Amino acid sequence: MSDQNEKSPSWVGDIIKLSPKYLLGLAVFSGIGLWLGNVGLGKTLGIKDAINSYKLYLGLVFLASTSFILSHFIWWISLGIKNKIDQKYSYKLQKERLRNLNRREKQILSPYIFDDVRSVELSITDGTAQELEHLKIIYRSSNISNRGSYFAYNIQPWARGYLTKNKHLLHESIDHIL
């Protein structure tokens, strides 16, 4: 097998990997070229004969580039839909988790709502705080510790709003107090 045949698939792969902005340029160029081959302006510009000679190649470039642009667009739309579905599912799980807080989680989240504080210092070794951070209910607002392993954590705006509307979720149950 010759070197030329071994290298041919790589240029095809390179074309497939082109950014949509370059594909759009190819589509516009080849589309205008095809159009100019059929109108008097092409003859006026002196390119009608050249376009007609390469019409097959221009047509292939036009079809391929518009197909790739369309596939990029469909992929972009599908990613957007997937992200929306994932976000909605995640939000549903987060709200469900807030409806089933244990005592330690209520202790961590209560100051944000009842004391109206924006930041609470929590130990980075506190597993409950880390779980709330993993669930994206709170987030570490600073990577610099003030006191050893204690870092400032803020509550996510959506969680603050949800818990402010549902303060009863942070109250201790009467059975536990008795």
UniProtKB/Swiss-Prot annotation:
The chain crosses the membrane at residues 22-42, 57-77. It is found in: Cell membrane. It is a multi-pass membrane protein. Keywords: Cell membrane, Membrane, Transmembrane, Transmembrane helix. InterPro entries: SieB. The keyword Calcium does not apply. GO terms for cellular component: plasma membrane. It holds the Pfam family SieB. This is SPbeta prophage-derived uncharacterized protein YopH. It comes from Bacillus subtilis (strain 168). The gene is yopH.
